[in-house]
Every structure is written in C-alpha cells, then in structure tokens.
Amino acid sequence: MEITDVRVRKLNEEGKMKAVVSVTFDNEFVVHDIKVIEGQNGLFIAMPSRKTPEGEFKDIAHPINSDTRNKLQSAILKEYEKAKEQEAAHKE
C-alpha cells in the first residue's frame, strides 16, 4: 500500500496540536483527521480516534506494524514542514 497524497488541512501555531492531515493510499482510500502533535520528544502523529463511554480514546484506524507507522509519520511530517514553510512565506 503506497501513500499517494498527504494534505495538511489545518495548521495551528499555538497549543500542542500543530496540524490536521488527510492521507490517501493507492489513490483509492483516504484517512482523515490524523493529527500532528508536539510532544516532549518532538513531533509525532496521532491517528483518528473516538472517545468511549468510559472516557478512553480508541483509534479508528491505525498501522499494525512499526515500519508502516514510521513510513506514514515520515510522509506526514515532511508535508507538514512544507506547509509551515509555505505559510511563513505568505506572511512575509
């Protein structure tokens, strides 16, 4: 399964959530609402989730192995950095 498109839909400068992203796989399947989060050890992605009646958050969709997660995170963070640079250029 190949990542064929990454769209940064919303950028935030303040707070820990830095962006909301949609990723398309094989030009056939899209996952919306992946979040770019700033943590203690740098940026990471959080998959879309829902809150259970018990107050826990459960992922709706997620990679099932670390190689796929790393590939997905790398692609998303690369596009996030590009979007940040473009936004900064528009502000100048």
UniProtKB/Swiss-Prot annotation:
Q: Name one GO biological process term.
A: division septum assembly
Does the record carry Cell division as a key word?
yes
Q: Which domain of life is it from?
A: Bacteria
InterPro entries named among the record's database cross-references: SpoVG, SpoVG_sf
What keywords sit in the KW lines? Cell cycle, Cell division, Septation
Q: Does the keyword Cell cycle apply?
A: yes
Q: Which Pfam families match?
A: SpoVG
Tell me the function of this protein.
Answer: Could be involved in septation.
Q: Which family does it belong to?
A: Belongs to the SpoVG family.
Which HAMAP family does this one have? SpoVG
What name has this protein been given in UniProt?
Answer: Putative septation protein SpoVG
